[in-house]
Amino acid sequence: MATTAVPAGGLKKIRVMVVDDSMVARGLIIRGLSAHPRIEIVGYAINTLDARNKIPQYKPDVITMDVEMPGQSGLDFLRQYLPTNPLPVILVSSLNLKVFDALAVGAVDFVRKPDDQQSTDAFIAALAQKVIIASNARPRPAAASAAGGGQTAPGAIPKLGPSASLDRVIIGLGASTGGTEATLAVMKRLPADIPPMVIVQHMPPGFTKMYAERLNRLCAMEVREAQSGDELKRGLALVAPADLQCRVVRIGTRYTVNCTPGEKVSGHRPSVDAMFHSMADVVTCRMVGIIMTGMGQDGAHGLVEMRKKGAYTIGQDKESSVVYGMPGVAQNIGAVMIQASCDNVSNVLLRHLKSLG
C-alpha cells in the first residue's frame, strides 16, 4: 500500500477509516472528510466484522463509527476490540443514550448525525475537527471502564455535614474531549451534600440533558441540565446546556446561573472560560475551579482569573488525560494550584473542602 501523502504544509495526513452500514452516511463522511487537507480516507467498512478484518490492512490513525449497525453493534465492537487495540474512535450517531456507553468503554468523542441538509456542512466541519483532535488523543479503554464501576456506591460516601463555610462554596468544572467519563469519575466519588457545582462539557445539542440524567443516576448528588434562574445550592450539580453560554450570577444573597445564546467564547458555546470568568466576578463566595481533559485552551484563562481572586484551582494531569490541551495550557500559564490524576481529583477536592471547616 502506498505511503500516506504529506500535504504542502509538511504535516502527515491523518489516515481515517469510516465504519457505517448506511451507504448514504458513508458517502457523506467520505466525501466531506476527503476534502480536508489534513485527512486521507484509507478505506471503509460496512459493519464491525468488516472493520475488524480491514483494520490491519488499512492501518488507520482514527476510525469514525456508527453506534447502531446490523449484527454486532459499534458498542459491542468497542468493548471487545479497544482493550487490546486502543485506536482513537469517533462515534457518529443520532441522538442515542448508547453514545455514553460507548464513551465509557473508550471511544474518544462523538458527533451527532445531521438531520437535514442545512446542518451537513457544520457536521463535516465538526467531524473533521474531532478527527484531528483524536489523532493526538490517547484512548483509555481500561480507565474508562474503571470509571463506570469498582467505586464506592454513591449512598456509601460520607456526607460533609452542616457547615456555614461550605454553604458559601461554588465549584466549577470544565472539560472537553474525554471529559464525559473523566467528569463522571470525579463526581461518583463526591457526597450527596457537595457544594453546588456548575459543569461545562463541550457537547452537541440534545446530548447535555441525557448526560445530566446519566450523571444523576450514577452519582450521589442531584444532577440536571441547567436552566436560567436555577439557584445554586448544596447537593446540586448543573450541566450547562449545549449551544448556550452558562454563567454564574449573584442576585442579592443568592447565586444562580444565566444560560443565554451569546457569542462563542474561546471558540465554544458553552464555554468553560465564560463560566470561569463569571465565577471570578463573584468575589463574595469561596470558589473552586477544576479543569479536565480536552483539546485547546478553553477554560485556561478563566481559571487564571479565578486563582487571582483567591479560588482553589485543580487541573487534571497529563498521564490521565485523553487530550492534555486545556489542563496543559492552564498548568503552563500558572492557573493550576495542584495537578491530580482523574481518579484523584475528587480526593484533592474533598481535602480542600474539609479544610474550610
Each predicted region: which residue ranges?
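Conserved acid/base catalytic micro-environments in cytosolic active-site loops
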Residues: 1-17, 22-34, 38, 44-64, ...
